[in-house]
């Protein structure tokens, strides 16, 4: 299983083996959602000579925001698809089979991957709760404590 945590500034790719994270092969990429927003605005400036408010970009990420002019919305959608392809390529580069490996996207970017990543196969799940990371570490901590108590006990 592979957990892909897409946060504000980073994307963490963490394999889970026997219900435990394998930190020896965990990879962090500096390609979080904020970098995606920055890239969208670079393209808007390049093509239209003006930026889009971060709030408007986030609204497109979350629900499509049909109230933006088409020329801006088209750039945003194109860049979101490119961003998702970049994340998918990270996973492939690490040697994971996108059709077979159970992949769980978590964090704020899980919604972006679900809406724009075009990955709807059965082995892919999306946990869109922005507190999922903290809840996951809490869960893993409890498993670790239970195992430690059993060994010592």
Please report, for each region that a protein language model flagged, where it lies by residue:
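Glycine-rich, phosphate-binding/catalytic loops in enzymes
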Residues: 19-22, 121-123
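Short, flexible active-site loops
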Residues: 20-28, 68-69
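Helical "lid/coupling" subdomains associated with nucleotide-phosphate turnover
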Residues: 1, 33-153
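Conserved acidic E/D residue at the C-terminus of a beta-strand in Rossmann-like folds
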Residues: 5, 27, 128
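Surface-exposed beta-loop interaction hotspot
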Residues: 15, 24-36
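Gly/Thr-rich phosphate-binding beta-strand-loop-beta motif of the actin/hexokinase/Hsp70
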Residues: 1-20, 40
